[in-house]
Amino acid sequence: PDTSLSAGEIENYFATYVIEQSAVDLGGIRNTVTVTGRSPNSSTNDISDISDDGDDDDGNTENDPTDIPITRSPALTVNKTAAVVEGSGNSITDLGDTINYTITVQNTGNVTLTGVTIVDDLENADGDNLTLTSGPDWSIADNGSSEGTLKVGETATYYASYLIEASGSDSGSIVNTAIITASSPVGTNDTTASSSVTTTTTEDPSIVVVKTYNIIENGVSGTNPNDIVQYQIAVTNTGNVTLSSINYVDTFTNRESI
């Protein structure tokens, strides 16, 4: 470049900078130029000036850096899916099956997110709390970040599971909600998102009754008057839901009326 400058002359210089993520995270770019020169009667660089930003209305009329503000927009998206693994030996979703949950969390903003945490709420259709069998456990981030950090555009995957118990199947459905919270350069825990998925269970109520007896003899061999007949009634819930208001009606007749 030309290193001389005539009186009244303006020389333009150009420089470029590719915006890096660290600059976005900090909210802007600050640039200052210092120009030095030598006057005709000097053997050293005796003239210098620090650049101004060209804005005399900002409260600083001299030697102020040129600032380029960058708007920081933290954001998250969460997606949750559920897949049922048959465990009860039938073709319906019910007691004994396992629900496997996959939760993906993506940084859809323009700043790095840290302190990423997940809270996974599990309830039945009545609003009663249920307990996950496992998870939620962090698995991987697709751009190499460790657990708790998400680069811009990066997606992390979590897994959880629930073995369906009576408290889950009796109500007719199971609702799972993942709530993600993260911190951005703008603030602590300032970025949240959530996603829910509902799994419907199928009721298949049934009952089996088996009645057996035992004769207690009164001292005389064989079945005779005054012997005692002791009945045992076994009632088995062979369905997949809890049964209530069980009622017993025992009809007793002699053989001639059978």
Where do the model's predicted regions map?
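Exported/extracytosolic protein signature
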Residues: 1-258
